[in-house]
Regions:
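Amphipathic, charge-rich alpha-helical segments that serve as recognition/docking helices
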Residues: 82-89, 133-181
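Short, charged/polar connector segments at secondary-structure boundaries
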Residues: 1-138
């Protein structure tokens, strides 16, 4: 699959943002951004409109020790580099569990993306959605003036944030899927 150009990805995101802003039920999420809260618009865009983040903290160490790291350094948005990143993300803990959860429940939380389609958060979800042959991903879009440093800080903060949701017990899971009348 050929990766669309940065401009093509940006245009896809601009189009989705414009359509979302026209809707009365536009979805927004709060993101801690530049010492304030940003209410970022959530859009559903084609998976082809996003690229995996080669600077992701989740895979940085694995990437540095990979024999194929040079492909990523040389051209992080090439097919080969994106394949390397995908493989590293698949090898992170609990990938199969995440993929199975997406298969069963769909994407519950939006990822975060730059205006040019670089994933800040949801890289692993993107790989899993592609593996499931899904066509779209839900993402909150950052402002166009976001710098690399701000993006890196946000990505680290989002990755380090603890998820306090607890698993359902077996009984509650059954009640959820098979209500008793």
């Amino acid at each position: 699959m050929a990766i669309p150009s940065e401009e093509a990805r940006a245009q896809s995101i601009r189009t989705a943002l414009a359509a979302a802003e026209k809707r009365s039920d536009v979805e927004r999420v709060r993101i801690a951004w530049k010492d304030t809260d940003l209410m970022a618009t959530v859009v559903e865009i084609p998976l082809s409109s996003v690229v995996l983040n080669h600077r992701s903290h989740r895979i940085r160490a694995q990437l540095e020790s990979s024999p194929r790291a040079e492909f990523v350094r040389r051209d992080p948005f090439s097919n080969e580099a994106q394949d390397v990143i995908s493989e590293l993300l698949r090898d992170t803990g609990r990938f199969d569990e995440l993929r199975d959860n997406l298969k069963d429940r769909g994407q519950l939380d939006p990822g975060v993306v730059t205006h040019t389609g670089l994933l800040v958060n949801a890289n692993t979800r993107c790989v899993a959605l592609r593996e499931l042959r899904k066509r779209h991903i839900r993402v909150a879009v950052l402002p166009e003036d976001a710098t690399e440093e701000e993006i890196d800080r946000l990505e680290l903060r989002l990755q380090m944030k603890r998820d306090f949701r607890r698993d359902y017990t077996f009984t509650n899971e059954l009640l959820h899927c098979c209500p008793v009348n």
